[in-house]
C-alpha cells in the first residue's frame, strides 16, 4: 500500500510504500520533520528501510539526513543528482528557501540498486524536465510522480537543469504508461492525489 503523508507549508508530500520494505519517498523539509514523525507514529510505523528522492530539490530532500539519523537508512537518488544532494548546490534550490541543505551520509545512486527495488515491486521511470534527474515510480498500479505532474498542473521547468521539452516528453510517457496499464491514481509531489485527468490538465500548461 501507499500511505500519503501530507506536505505542510512549502514541504513536499511524502509517501510511504508499505510492502516487503518500508520505503519513504521524499521526506520533505527538515522544518516539518517533527510533523512527519508524528504522522508515522500515528500510523504505527516503527521502521524505515530506504529513502527515495524523486529529485534533489530542498523541499523534497532536506529531511533526508534526519530520517537517516533516526532510522539508520540510506537515501537513493538518480545518478546525475547524487553530486547535487551531496553538495547542497544551486541545483537543490536551497537558496530559494533561505536555507542550507544538510545531506544524508549514505547516498546510493539509483543505478546501483534499481534491480533490488524491482524485487520490492517498484518500477522506476526516468522523467526529466523538472530537473534532469527526476524520476517517477510505479507501484501497485499507481504512479508517484514527484514534481513532474500534479493533479491540476505541472512542475516548473525554469529552475537549474529544468527543460520544458523534456518535461513534455516525460508527461507524455507517463500518460502512455498510465493508459496502457490502466493506472488511474497519481501521487504527486505537492497537492492532492490525482487521476488520469491530470494529463488533460497538463496539456493546458505545456
UniProtKB/Swiss-Prot annotation:
Organism per entry: Methanocaldococcus jannaschii (strain ATCC 43067 / DSM 2661 / JAL-1 / JCM 10045 / NBRC 100440) (Methanococcus jannaschii)
Cofactor(s) needed: Zn(2+)
Protein family (similarity comment): Belongs to the metallo-beta-lactamase superfamily.
SUPFAM superfamilies: Metallo-hydrolase/oxidoreductase
Domain of life: Archaea
Binding site for Zn(2+) 2: 59-60, 147, 190
PANTHER family associated with the record: HYDROXYACYLGLUTATHIONE HYDROLASE GLOC
InterPro entries, alphabetized: MBL_Glyoxalase_II (IPR051453), Metallo-B-lactamas (IPR001279), RibonucZ/Hydroxyglut_hydro (IPR036866)
SMART domains: Lactamase_B
Phylogenetic lineage: Archaea, Methanobacteriati, Methanobacteriota, Methanomada group, Methanococci
Positions that bind Zn(2+) 1: 55, 57, 130, 147
E.C. no: 3.-.-.-
Main enzyme class: hydrolase
UniProt keyword terms in alphabetical order: Hydrolase, Metal-binding, Zinc
Cofactor binding annotation: Binds 2 Zn(2+) ions per subunit.
Regions crossing the membrane: none
Pfam family, one: Lactamase_B
Annotated Gene3D superfamilies: Ribonuclease Z/Hydroxyacylglutathione hydrolase-like
Record's protein name: Probable metallo-hydrolase MJ0888
GO molecular function: hydrolase activity; metal ion binding
Amino acid at each position: 500500500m501507499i500511505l500519503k503523508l501530507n506536505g505542510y507549508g512549502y514541504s513536499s508530500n511524502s509517501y510511504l510504500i508499505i510492502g516487503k520494505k518500508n520505503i519513504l519517498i521524499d521526506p520533505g523539509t527538515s522544518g516539518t520533520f517533527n510533523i512527519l514523525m508524528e504522522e508515522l507514529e500515528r500510523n504505527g510505523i516503527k521502521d524505515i528501510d530506504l529513502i527515495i528522492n524523486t529529485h534533489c530539490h530542498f523541499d523534497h530532500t532536506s529531511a533526508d539526513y534526519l530520517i537517516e539519523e533516526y532510522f539508520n537508512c540510506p537515501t537513493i537518488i538518480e545518478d546525475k543528482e547524487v553530486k547535487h544532494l551531496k553538495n547542497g548546490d544551486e541545483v537543490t534550490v536551497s537558496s530559494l528557501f533561505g536555507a542550507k541543505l544538510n545531506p544524508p551520509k549514505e547516498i546510493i545512486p539509483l543505478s546501483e540498486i534499481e534491480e533490488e527495488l524491482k524485487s520490492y515491486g517498484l518500477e522506476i521511470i526516468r522523467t526529466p524536465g523538472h530537473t534532469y534527474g527526476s524520476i517517477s515510480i510505479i507501484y501497485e498500479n499507481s504512479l508517484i510522480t514527484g514534481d513532474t505532474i500534479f493533479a491540476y498542473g505541472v512542475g516548473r521547468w525554469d529552475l537549474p537543469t529544468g527543460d520544458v521539452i523534456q518535461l513534455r516528453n516525460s508527461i507524455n510517457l507517463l500518460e502512455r504508461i498510465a493508459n496502457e496499464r490502466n493506472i488511474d491514481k497519481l501521487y504527486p509531489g505537492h497537492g492532492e492525489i490525482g487521476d488520469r485527468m491530470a494529463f488533460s490538465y497538463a496539456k493546458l500548461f505545456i
